[in-house]
Amino acid sequence: MPKLIWIPESVVEAMLKDASRWHDLETGGTFMGYWSDANVAVITKMIDGGSEAIRTRKSFSPDREWEQSEIDRHYRVSGRVDTYIGDWHTHPNAQSGEPSWTDRRCLRTIIRSPEARAPRPVMILLCGGPENWLPHAWIGQLTRRALLFERVETTAATISTYKT
């Protein structure tokens, strides 16, 4: 069954604004939300990278301490309904919306992290530039490749927006 990600229009607008602000550098953030069923993720909030985030032409690393405090705060405010559900970041001037090797490694780390509690993290990549950012949505999951080896499988997802 196809994967679907619901995201508020206001979150998409905030992502595009941040992407255009840092257009030559990678930028990104964190998503809070929930899975309404096995194939439908609902994003309710985006947490930006924070003031101490590191942005370069080829990588983005959020301000982890600030990010975690915002995740904790939103979790409490939501009545413990919304949890960490994934991330987004830009690939400036990229032609392909496929997750990079680094993106797959990041997904593996998230999936294996007990603190994240995200066995199927969402990853949205904004590719292009200020005039033409194109979103590409993925769901990550570990699959067994052989008896002892695991690999990250990424499944494309459809993005639908909603008004809040």
UniProtKB/Swiss-Prot annotation:
GO terms under biological process: proteolysis
A Pfam family it matches = Prok-JAB
- The entry marks the following residues as binding Zn(2+), namely 89, 91, 103
Q: Which domain of life is it from?
A: Bacteria
Q: Does the keyword Hydrolase apply?
A: yes
Domain annotation MPN: ranges = 5-142
What are the GO MF terms of this UniProt record? metal ion binding; metallopeptidase activity
* InterPro entries reported in the protein's UniProt record: CAP3, JAB_dom_prok, MPN
Which PROSITE patterns does this UniProt record tie to the protein? MPN
The question of whether Protease is a record keyword is answered with yes
Name the UniProt key words of this record, in alphabetical order. Answer: Hydrolase, Metal-binding, Metalloprotease, Plasmid, Protease, Zinc
The text of the family note is: Belongs to the peptidase M67B family.
Kindly provide the name given to this protein in its UniProt entry.
Probable metalloprotease y4qB
Question: Origin organism of this chain?
Answer: Sinorhizobium fredii (strain NBRC 101917 / NGR234)
Highest lineage ranks of the organism? Bacteria, Pseudomonadati, Pseudomonadota, Alphaproteobacteria, Hyphomicrobiales
